[in-house]
Amino acid sequence: MIFTQLLNKMQTIKYNYLLYMKKIAFLFLTIRDVNFTKIWDKYFSGNEDKYSIYIHPKFPNEAKWRTDKIISNIKETAWGFITRAYLELFKEAIKDKDNFKFITISESCIPIQSFDNLYKTLASDNRSWIKLMKITKYKHDVILKKNTGNFIHHYARMCLNRHHVKQLLINRDKLEFFHNMQIGDEYFLSVLYPLSNYKDIEITYDDWEYVNEQVKELKNQIKLLYEEQEHNTNTNNKEKINILQDKIKDIAKNPKSITKVIDDLQKIKNSKAFFYRKFTINSDIEDYWEDIINKKLKIKL
C-alpha cells in the first residue's frame, strides 16, 4: 500500500516536472481581433506560464486585443491565401524554446474545453494533431493534376509539435507553390511527406456536414431544372441554374457560421474537439460558453 502511494507520488512529480516550463503557442490569424476577446481572456486566465500568444491581423492598426502580441512581419492575406501568414507565425513562435506545441487559431474560433484539459492532453502526447482529408477527384484534377509530388490534404486548423514546425521552416523554399495556390492552407503540410508522428484528429471542429447538406439540396434543385428543360423545349432554366451554381460555390467555401447557438448547442457539447468554429461576431455564444466549459470539465480524457 505504501509502495503504491509512493509510486503514484513519484509519477505525479515526474509528470509535473515534464510540464515545467512547457508552453503551448497559440497562433491567431485574424482580420482585426478575435471575435470574442472576453472568452479568450477567461480561458487563458491563471495559466500565464503555460501559453504564448502570437497574432497576425490583416489590419494590425485596427486591432485592440493584446496588441503587444502582434508579430512584426505582417503578410497580405485573402480567402484561401494564408500560408505566408502561417509561416510568419511559426517563425516567430519557434524562437521561444519553451513552446512545445503550436496551434493555429482563427478569429471565429472559441475554446470548448478548459485550458487545463488541453494542456494535460498535449503534454502527454508528443505527436502533432493533424486532421487528414481525402483528395477528391475534382480537387486533384483542378488543383493538383499538373503538379508532380506527393500531396497531403488536411484541415487548415492544426496542432504541430516542435519537430514538425522546424521541418516546415527548414523546407520553407518548398512552400512557394502553396503560397500561390488557393486553399494552400489545406495542403502545405505536404512538404512534410511522408508524414509521421502525428495523430489524425481534429483539434478544431468545423461544421461541414451542414454545408454539405445545403450543397446537396441545391444540386438536387439544379437537377430538377435540367430535367424540366429537357422535357419542355420551350423552357430555359439557364439563368436559374447559374444562380444556384454560384450559390453552391459561395456556400462551399466555409463551414457553417453560427449566430444563434441554441440550435447547435448539443452538437458543441458533444464534440470531442478542443475548439469550435465559425462563430460570427454577432453570435450569442458568450451566453452559453460557461455552460459548455463546465460540461466539458466532467469529461474524463
What do these predicted ranges mean?
Residues 2-12, 235:
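Compositionally biased low-complexity segments enriched in polar/charged residues
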Residues 3, 15-20:
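Aromatic (phenylalanine/tyrosine) cluster motif
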Residues 6-9, 17, 244:
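Generic short amphipathic/hydrophobic targeting helices enriched at N-termini
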Residues 20-301:
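ER/Golgi luminal nucleotide-sugar-dependent glycosyltransferases, focusing on the catalytic module
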